[in-house]
């Protein structure tokens, strides 16, 4: 039996992750440095992350990192499906400039993501699109855009590499937020970046 009998888009993406890790982390670090001014991030005490499909799962998976690196008295970190966030979130009570609303979407195309970001803008929250498409509706709606710069791949579906990119971007943001707010020691961002590459290479 030949190994190539088991070749498929998902297995190809799985096997590509160790090689993807370093350029993905570098790309996300570049995007993060250009995303939100540090004086804006320093005010953040509440974070709401939303997405659809694998982006929603990335939002959920990233919450422990935010709690670990940026958790402090009075802080709150939550996630929600984009449709639920758009319908049921009381944006007027989030905290205005002290609240960061992140819409995660590689394509930046889902209407619900843009709707959430638009409502965040309306109520004075800090809105951020974490995406790989700077011309997307989400990027154009959000006050700030965090481009993760995921390298191209012959077959982008299913979205495993996009999920990896979204989660990497969120992890790095959590570490940077922790550094800026004094919840984590200097070097937390650098340490997170190195750990992401090292751990993925060990797969």
Q: Which residues does each PLM region occupy?
A:
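Cofactor-pocket helix-loop regions in the catalytic cores of large enzyme subunits
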Residues: 22-36, 188-203
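Glycine-rich phosphate-binding loops that contact phosphosugars or nucleotide phosphates
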Residues: 42-198
